[in-house]
Amino acid sequence: MALPDFSMRQLLEAGVHFGHQTHRWNPKMAPYIYGDRNNIHILDLSQTVPLLHNALKIVSDTVARGGRVLFVGTKRQASDIIADAANRSAQYYVNARWLGGMMTNWKTISNSIQRLRKLDELLAGEAQGFTKKERLNLEREREKLDRALGGIKDMGSVPDLMFIIDTNKEAIAIQEAKRLGIPVVAVIDSNCDPDQIDYPIPGNDDAARAIALYCDLIARAALDGIARQQGAMGIDVGAQAEAPVEPALEAPAEGA
């Protein structure tokens, strides 16, 4: 595999260049703005192209070395797209509501994930010993936990990289990433603060077609990273197959 390709035409057709109304802008976005039309800021796609390519490379490199990417997008038009892209690329997501402390208080979140797993086990069977009302309450609790944590249930620990749609809406997620030193890839619209983002992608963060394009490209970059990781593992395994490693590995076990 290779990094996913995209063209300027694709970005234009998806409406990536359309920012917000000029009076809603963040002046820090001035370097990324081409101009305005009918009181709408037009983002400079000649900058978006290389920055998007760089973001895709960061995602692929992170996954290739065994890292985890967390997709974050809780706004209505991003929610389903975010979950689909993360699932398709074997990554993780938050698409309902960002719970304060989701990264910075991982221990508490882990306890909630354990509770979700327990409920999954209980309800996978017949949930014997429970009344109909008790079972209904368990199902409601499970549904609530799954909506909040289902996308990170198997993540294991905090991610190595975060990809964010709408930096204003997900400001708490970005603050937590900063505190933990987790790098952030994010789409920055004309009303955003680019200073908070390690790998910015100037572009529209509201249009469903634009969101779908970003998420598809990021997911494919993650899949490229998985392919590279597996390729590297294949080379290692091949090298080991020719060397007499088995006895060397067994020696410590015998002495233990």
UniProtKB/Swiss-Prot annotation:
CDD domains: RPS2. It comes from the Bacteria. The keyword Ribonucleoprotein applies. Pfam families: Ribosomal_S2. Keywords: Ribonucleoprotein, Ribosomal protein. Coiled coil: none annotated. GO terms for biological process: translation. GO terms for cellular component: cytosolic small ribosomal subunit. The keyword Ubl conjugation does not apply. GO terms for molecular function: structural constituent of ribosome. Belongs to the universal ribosomal protein uS2 family. HAMAP family: Ribosomal_uS2_B (MF_00291_B). This is Small ribosomal subunit protein uS2. It comes from Brucella anthropi (strain ATCC 49188 / DSM 6882 / CCUG 24695 / JCM 21032 / LMG 3331 / NBRC 15819 / NCTC 12168 / Alc 37).
